[in-house]
From Swiss-Prot:
It comes from Bacillus cereus (strain B4264). ATP binds at G64, P65, E66, S67, S68, G69, K70, T71. This is Protein RecA. InterPro entries: AAA+_ATPase, DNA_recomb/repair_RecA, DNA_recomb/repair_RecA_CS, P-loop_NTPase, RecA-like_C, RecA-like_N, RecA_ATP-bd, RecA_C_sf. One of its GO terms (molecular function) is ATP hydrolysis activity. One of its GO terms (biological process) is DNA recombination. Can catalyze the hydrolysis of ATP in the presence of single-stranded DNA, the ATP-dependent uptake of single-stranded DNA by duplex DNA, and the ATP-dependent hybridization of homologous single-stranded DNAs. It interacts with LexA causing its activation and leading to its autocatalytic cleavage. The keyword Amino-acid biosynthesis does not apply. The gene is recA. HAMAP family: RecA. The lineage of its organism: Bacteria, Bacillati, Bacillota, Bacilli, Bacillales. It comes from the Bacteria. GO terms for cellular component: cytosol. The keyword Ribosomal protein does not apply. SUPFAM superfamilies: P-loop containing nucleoside triphosphate hydrolases, RecA protein, C-terminal domain.
Amino acid sequence: MSDRQAALDMALKQIEKQFGKGSIMKLGEQAERRVSTVSSGSLALDVALGVGGYPRGRIIEIYGPESSGKTTVSLHAIAEVQRQGGQAAFIDAEHAMDPVYAQKLGVNIDELLLSQPDTGEQGLEIAEALVRSGAVDIIVIDSVAALVPKAEIEGDMGDSHVGLQARLMSQALRKLSGAINKSKTIAIFINQIREKVGVMFGNPETTPGGRALKFYSTVRLEVRRAEQLKQGNDIVGNKTKVKVVKNKVAPPFRVAEVDIMYGEGISREGEILDMASELDIVQKSGAWYSYNEERLGQGRENSKQFLKENTDLREEIAFFIREHHGISEDSGAEGVEDPTLLD
């Protein structure tokens, strides 16, 4: 053994003695190189994310215009975690949580931990305490824009508080990121969008709360309404596009198209029908949809209704979609972190 190697081994032993086992290791020896994921609750979004869902122990940012479906997407993730026996928490900084709607999306409201903090500091401290407990699988903060610093709440209405929220978020994320990774908690931050003043060229839209969240996020999702869905003259929902703007665990810029139905959330039948048609698992001839020479219905809405009533057939088609994209259905679905996508 060379003197250099002996010196390195001694240094490694000293580091492990001082900071604990696992504080330093060779990358190839790391037991958890593979990224464990939890389904987003939407098959189309799982495919767009590239690894079959949200990566555990990471920060996710979901942003978009008002009423675009940001909270709906987050509630579906909570419902999926609960379905697998996990614990979920919701920090409702906007004080706008609708338990009836959440229940319709499959959320077990009797088991969901809910906090409606008075200040941004309080909300982030509660989030930190829950994450450090190691007993929470997913935590949603709704929203970053509503995490108002204490100084702003206690000040007068016209007072200027430049950069206060950005400093709050930067400090909180520095403390939270390590704890989130160790506890394997999925932390979803919902964010709004704002317009930059005086931007002549390029995109004038930005998200509040400074730049820290953009850097710390493993995945950033942009949620936007594409068009209205109608039954006759009635508007029953929106076709929504979810774009993966940033992704450290798979290639970014993939887009998931989902139907968000009023009072129901993401239509599983709609996304399965669209994806199966693209892959030719379901054949479309004129207005008719068919699977294995069995007609599902005339028109998209009738075919969606048929799949809703025939769940075994729906899940069989979903299985073939997952198989095509190499996505596992169980919560232990794994993907390898791509080093070329790291900041």
